Design a protein with these regions (language model features):
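C-terminal motif of bacterial Sec signal peptides marking the signal peptidase cleavage site
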Residues: 17-20
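Short, linear, compositionally biased motifs with a strong N-terminal bias
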Residues: 10-13
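Bacterial N-terminal signal peptides that target proteins for export
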Residues: 1-8
Length: 190
């Protein structure tokens, strides 16, 4: 009987070896190695300029005054993004919101954008959000607005791509009568 048990156990081990069962993982690479197989995004830096396309106001803002604060909501403007990357180079609809001091014009600005590239990207657009501060520049009648933005591609060949950028605007007047901005950023794609 002992011999029969030994033979059965031996055949069981041989059978398991033949079908590939073992206590070793059959994964071709370890979990640590699997992480290195994931694609890292391609980073494409870009620079550019941001300025209004006359007549740039598409929709007037709703403005409320609260003490020294001027609260603006829903101003829609048409702008030109002249960028070194043809994926970002195009026109932008910018919805601006903000809270500014009535005397100094300083405050916070935030909003959302839709950028339509001039390049044929299969109908895709960029959608994003931004926030920042506007402060007096030291030159009378000029303010500096520094913005940080994040966005993503929707549709066409830019679907799934992302961008991150910084914009520095020199703004004329309070309320603004015009501006010229510099853009620096990166596009992230897989």
């Amino acid at each position: 009987m002992k011999t029969l048990k030994c033979v059965l156990v031996l055949f069981s081990f041989v059978g398991l070896m033949l079908v590939g069962c073992s206590d070793q993982s059959q994964s071709p690479v370890s979990p640590m190695d699997q992480g290195s197989l994931e694609k890292k995004p391609t980073v494409t830096p870009f620079t550019g300029a941001d300025y209004p396309i006359p007549p740039y106001i598409l929709q007037e803002a709703v403005v409320h005054e609260q003490g020294q604060k001027r609260i603006m909501h829903g101003l829609k403007m048409l702008e030109r993004w002249e960028c070194s990357s043809d994926l970002m180079d195009g026109t932008m609809i910018n919805e601006v919101n903000g809270v500014q001091d009535n005397d100094t014009g300083e405050g916070t600005v935030y909003g959302k954008v839709t950028v339509t590239p001039y390049k044929d990207v299969g109908g895709g657009v960029w959608e994003g959000e931004y926030h920042g501060k506007i402060v007096q520049s030291g030159t009378p009648g000029i303010w500096t607005c520094t913005l940080s933005g994040l966005g993503h591609g929707r549709g066409g060949i830019i679907e799934g791509m992302k961008y991150k950028l910084e914009v520095v605007l020199k703004v004329n007047g309070f309320p603004a009568t015009g501006w010229l901005g510099t853009i620096t950023g990166n596009i992230y794609s897989h």
